[in-house]
């Protein structure tokens, strides 16, 4: 059968929060079957636990923030994208601050950390959410849609009236049965415009942002000396965000997500709409791994 997955070993990292600019210590620990991904604010007494779930998202300004009784865990989407890409179901994520570390602005460092910890299969079937019918949410000219698909596919399009974007592909579609998340999506960094940064900082946002953890664009060009990691890195990062946001459903998906200019708020609205329409999805397991339309890399054997 396709089994649930957790980590083999504890893994630690240190970084800064993209929006708070605060130093943050992160520890990721293995967790039992059916735990899900649980964030723990260990800087608080008593410690507050917030499970990654669609209905736990309380703020969606520039990131997905989990909120419970006024306690926050911000910018969870890049880490959750790495967890989704590696098919990890269960983990405890301990944090010393109200925001995940931004690392280099992509999911790449998280993928590396998780692979270094090693992935362990558990004694229970992995649960998938299979999309059974089309569901769409809209806001102005933005849309987010789920459609049935025998596998996991993400199609995303963006529209920026800007010289840097006009010369690059603003549409990408990836079927994850044939394309590696780790190779094609994980390294895409978040991006921002110089013109927005002063305003964001006046709102106490993007305080930790720099060319070390984001692609920064002025009126005409990309300011990062090394340029882009993928020619379509902008739209690939929006896919990365969406994959992380969708993992807040709590299980891996069997279906296609189609986003047009969608962001964290609309992605979350789609999850809530799917959960509201109980006939739009079903939870499935696979006794025979060869029957599954989705596959994951074999667990990486970490040093014992």
From Swiss-Prot:
Pathway: Glycolipid biosynthesis; lipid IV(A) biosynthesis; lipid IV(A) from (3R)-3-hydroxytetradecanoyl-[acyl-carrier-protein] and UDP-N-acetyl-alpha-D-glucosamine: step 2/6. The keyword Transport does not apply. The keyword Heme does not apply. The active site is at residue 264. One of its GO terms (cellular component) is membrane. Keywords: Hydrolase, Lipid A biosynthesis, Lipid biosynthesis, Lipid metabolism, Metal-binding, Zinc. Zn(2+) binds at residues 78, 237, 241. Its cofactor is Zn(2+). InterPro entries: Ribosomal_Su5_D2-typ_SF, UDP-acyl_GlcNac_deAcase, UDP-acyl_GlcNac_deAcase_C, UDP-acyl_N-AcGlcN_deAcase_N. Transmembrane segments: none annotated. GO terms for molecular function: metal ion binding; UDP-3-O-acyl-N-acetylglucosamine deacetylase activity. One of its GO terms (biological process) is lipid A biosynthetic process. SUPFAM superfamilies: Ribosomal protein S5 domain 2-like (SSF54211). Its EC number is 3.5.1.108. It catalyses: a UDP-3-O-[(3R)-3-hydroxyacyl]-N-acetyl-alpha-D-glucosamine + H2O = a UDP-3-O-[(3R)-3-hydroxyacyl]-alpha-D-glucosamine + acetate. Belongs to the LpxC family. Catalyzes the hydrolysis of UDP-3-O-myristoyl-N-acetylglucosamine to form UDP-3-O-myristoylglucosamine and acetate, the committed step in lipid A biosynthesis. PANTHER family: UDP-3-O-ACYL-N-ACETYLGLUCOSAMINE DEACETYLASE 1, MITOCHONDRIAL-RELATED. NCBIfam families: lpxC. This is UDP-3-O-acyl-N-acetylglucosamine deacetylase. The lineage of its organism: Bacteria, Pseudomonadati, Pseudomonadota, Gammaproteobacteria, Oceanospirillales. The gene is lpxC.
């Amino acid at each position: 059968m396709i089994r649930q997955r957790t980590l083999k070993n504890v893994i630690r990292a240190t970084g800064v929060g993209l929006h708070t600019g605060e130093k943050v210590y992160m520890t990721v620990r293995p967790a039992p079957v059916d735990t899900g991904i649980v964030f723990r604010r260990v800087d608080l007494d008593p410690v507050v636990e917030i499970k990654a779930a669609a209905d736990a998202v309380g703020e969606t300004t520039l990131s997905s923030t989990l909120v419970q009784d006024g306690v926050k865990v911000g910018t969870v989407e890049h880490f959750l994208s790495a967890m989704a890409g590696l098919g990890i179901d269960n983990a405890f994520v301990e944090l010393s601050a109200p925001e995940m570390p931004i690392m280099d602005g992509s999911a790449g460092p998280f993928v590396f950390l998780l692979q270094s910890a090693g992935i362990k299969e558990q004694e229970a079937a992995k649960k998938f959410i299979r999309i059974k019918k089309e569901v769409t949410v809209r806001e102005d000219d933005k849309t987010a849609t789920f459609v049935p698909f025998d596998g996991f596919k993400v199609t995303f399009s963006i529209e920026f009236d800007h010289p840097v974007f006009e010369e690059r592909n603003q549409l990408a579609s990836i079927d994850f049965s044939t394309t590696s998340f780790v190779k094609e999506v994980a390294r895409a960094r978040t991006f921002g415009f110089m013109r927005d940064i002063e305003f964001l900082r006046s709102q106490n946002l993007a305080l930790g942002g720099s060319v070390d953890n984001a692609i920064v664009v002025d009126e005409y060009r990309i300011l990062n000396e090394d340029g882009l990691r993928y020619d379509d890195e902008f739209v690939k990062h929006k896919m990365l965000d969406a994959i992380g946001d969708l993992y807040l459903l709590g299980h891996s998906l069997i279906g296609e997500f189609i986003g047009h200019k969608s962001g964290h708020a609309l992605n979350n609205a789609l999850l809530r709409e799917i959960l509201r329409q109980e006939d739009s999805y079903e939870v499935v397991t696979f006794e025979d791994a060869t029957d599954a339309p989705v596959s994951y890399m074999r667990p990486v054997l970490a040093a014992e």
